[in-house]
Regions:
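Residue-level recognition of transmembrane alpha-helices
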Residues: 12-15, 38-41, 94, 120, ...
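Structural signature of hydrophobic alpha-helical transmembrane segments
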Residues: 3-14, 83-94, 136-149, 210-221
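C-terminal ends of transmembrane helices
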Residues: 19-28, 98-110, 152-161, 225-239
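Hydrophobic residues within membrane-embedded alpha-helical segments of Major Facilitator Superfamily
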Residues: 14, 18-21, 37, 41-44, ...
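Alpha-helical multi-pass transmembrane bundles of energy-transducing inner-membrane proteins
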Residues: 28-33, 115-122, 126-209
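Juxtamembrane/interfacial segments at transmembrane-helix boundaries in multi-pass membrane proteins
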Residues: 56-78, 177-237, 257-261
Length: 266
């Protein structure tokens, strides 16, 4: 029987809160405490995702574990979460990789340990929000917010050219996402002021509008995957990023964009 707990909310906010607690440990004098809290937080975030998988009804189509709460009522923006058969696997994988990244950092990172571990935990929660977000604006906030921890990971703990690589990564992905924002705003007005993603594929859009919307989403996700010819930020980011950052770039951010490009119901 499905749990009555807000499991998707927990998958998002458990790692984020754990990350904030890690930040609260302060300087590197408390590095061991920061590592311990980070590991506990990462494991807790992973264990929360297990009921999503075990209780998921694979015989049922559509979204499951849905949570719907008004967020910004004036603009009909809701805190709407849900997962399908693909999303639930990505949430599980994302949380598991976070555990591995935290463990791998124990003996490698020597400066600003708390901040490094917190960045990965917070990004893990934000990425789960990307996989579960069913409100377009909520999804967009999560999709863009996960850039900030990655920008810091590259820019602070990266190689000699880390600042250049971090800025290039941030600008490419941010500017690419503006096309997606424009498409969401257009769909918002076409759907009678609604940001509900599940409603967008029902809209009677003309062929020209469909093509333009497809191009906007395709280009936005292509930058983050990345795909040629908008891939030039990736070599710099991979070379300059610390090991954990490269893992996240390869296994999380790129895969998140692939998933949205294939599965987004718009």
């Amino acid at each position: 029987m499905p749990s009555e707990l807000p499991l998707l909310t927990l998958t998002i906010w458990v790692p984020i809160i754990a990350g904030l607690l890690v930040l609260a440990t302060g300087s590197d004098r408390n590095a061991n405490l920061a590592k311990l809290i980070a590991l506990i937080g990462a494991l807790a975030g992973f264990f929360v995702t297990i009921p999503l998988y075990t209780q998921f009804d694979a015989s049922s189509a559509g979204m499951q574990f849905e949570e719907l709460t008004p967020w910004i009522a004036t603009f009909h923006i809701n805190y709407h979460l849900g997962v399908d058969g693909i999303s639930v696997l990505f949430v599980l994988l994302n949380s598991f990789i976070t555990v591995l990244v935290v463990i791998a950092a124990w003996e490698v990172v020597e400066k600003k340990v708390a901040q490094y571990l917190a960045a990965f935990l917070i990004m893990s929660g934000l990425m789960n929000g990307v996989f579960a977000g069913l409100d377009a604006m909520l999804f967009y906030v999560f999709f863009e917010a996960m850039l900030i921890p990655m920008f810091l990971i590259i820019g602070v703990w990266g190689g000699p050219n880390r600042v250049y690589a971090a800025v290039k990564f941030f600008l490419y992905t941010l500017l690419g996402s503006l096309l997606m924002l424009a498409a969401f705003i257009y769909l918002y007005f076409q759907a009678n002021s609604s940001f509900e993603i599940l409603e967008y594929h029902k809209l009677p859009l003309g062929m020209t509008a469909q093509i333009l919307i497809f191009i906007a989403f395709f280009m936005s996700f292509a930058v983050k995957v990345p795909m040629w010819p908008v891939h030039t930020w990736l070599p710099d980011a991979h070379v300059e990023a610390p090991t954990g950052g490269s893992v996240v770039l390869a296994a999380k951010i790129g895969r998140a964009s692939c998933r949205e490009r294939v599965c987004c119901k718009v």
